[in-house]
Design a protein with these regions (language model features):
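Compact, glycine-rich, soluble single-domain proteins
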Residues: 34-55
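Conserved small/polar residues in nucleotide/adenosyl-binding loops
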Residues: 98-99
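Mid-chain, well-packed structural core segment of small domains
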Residues: 58-84
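N-terminal first-folded block
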Residues: 3-39
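Internal alpha/beta domain cores that form substrate/cofactor-binding pockets in large enzymes
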Residues: 11, 35-41, 71-80
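Short acidic active-site motifs
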Residues: 11, 47-48, 90-91
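Well-formed, non-transmembrane alpha-helical positions, independent of function
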Residues: 51, 71-72, 94
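Short, acidic/turn-prone active-site loops that include or flank metal/cofactor-
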Residues: 43, 84-90
Length: 99
């Protein structure tokens, strides 16, 4: 499983459509394995769902996200946890604990 987080300086970036980076976490046996930072190369909103799908992402954790982007993620089969704030690493750890 792969979890992506909208990312800026260790924190969850608060606007999905404007994020310039995702931190992607490879999850193995319910634990965080390898992580990497991916630049979005200027892609925004709906294009980001395709970008994440191409990277094999199953789940997205982010701050604010509009209805169009939510629909694009749903169509791509990516589970969404929106409205999240705080440290990216902690959010992923919490997600693993409570799912």
């Amino acid at each position: 499983m792969k979890i992506a987080v909208t990312y800026e300086n260790g924190q969850i970036f608060q606007h999905f459509g404007h994020t310039q980076q995702f931190k992607v976490y490879q999850i193995n046996d319910g634990k965080i394995g390898e992580t990497k930072i991916l630049g979005t190369d200027g892609n925004g909103h709906g294009a980001l769902a395709g970008f994440l799908k191409a990277e094999g992402v199953d789940t997205l954790i982010c701050g604010g996200i509009g209805a169009g982007a939510q629909s694009a993620l749903k169509e791509a089969g990516i589970k969404l946890y929106g409205g999240v704030t705080g440290e990216a690493d902690k959010a992923v750890e919490d997600c693993l604990l409570y799912t």
